[in-house]
């Protein structure tokens, strides 16, 4: 399917630490996908953060040129820096260019109480500890999979953004299993229990 192909290409062809798909590849899919401007890690967010309106306008125009009505702007409320200011700056551009804004959540974990587990993984990746006073905290406990009701309550002052999001959902067909775990398999010698895997850690 298109989703699997995009994800595979993003992982296999990226020269960055995170999966990336280039703009030309996106253009090839213009008739099959809805393009959303992106959140805090997007070029648009960075341009408006620097108050570079002309660059932000150029980015928007480059997407609408190819995706037409299937390009929308995106705002989030995850209690992270600069989100409020970004919302204020993106509104005039949306009105000027006649582009809908959708409300999304930058989801990184399933439940709100998974936040500490996520932060632990981040610390492992960055060689930091949870109680390190100098550790940069770039994620929020609000980045969990919220229900429709929670999102509606979060954006109750601008419910049209939720309505725009619902319109996109009508164009998409997505399903995933939340009950099954997909974890790597580690070989264990015969006649040895899985506690064998903890031995190297205990020795260290």
What are these regions (language model features)?
Residues 3-197:
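Phosphodiester-processing cores and adjacent nucleic acid-binding clamps
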Residues 198-204:
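A short, hydrophobic C-terminal helix/tail in secreted or cell-surface proteins
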């Amino acid at each position: 399917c298109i989703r699997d192909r995009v994800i595979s290409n993003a992982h296999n062809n990226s020269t960055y630490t995170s999966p990336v798909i280039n703009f030309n590849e996106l253009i090839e899919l213009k008739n099959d996908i809805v393009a959303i401007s992106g959140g805090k890690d997007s070029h648009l967010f960075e341009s408006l953060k620097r108050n570079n309106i002309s660059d932000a306008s150029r980015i928007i125009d480059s997407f609408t040129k190819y995706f037409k009505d299937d390009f929308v702007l995106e705002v989030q409320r995850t209690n992270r820096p600069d989100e409020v200011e970004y919302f204020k700056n993106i509104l005039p551009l949306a009105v000027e260019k006649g582009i809908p804004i959708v409300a999304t959540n930058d989801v990184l974990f399933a439940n709100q109480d998974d936040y500490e587990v996520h932060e632990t993984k981040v610390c492992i990746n960055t060689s930091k500890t949870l109680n390190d006073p100098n550790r940069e905290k770039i994620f929020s406990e609000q980045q969990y999979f919220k229900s429709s009701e929670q999102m509606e309550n979060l954006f109750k002052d601008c419910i049209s953004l939720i309505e725009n999001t619902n319109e996109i959902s009508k164009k998409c067909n997505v399903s995933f299993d939340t009950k099954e775990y997909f974890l790597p398999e580690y070989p264990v010698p015969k006649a040895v229990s899985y506690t064998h895997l903890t031995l190297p850690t205990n020795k260290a």
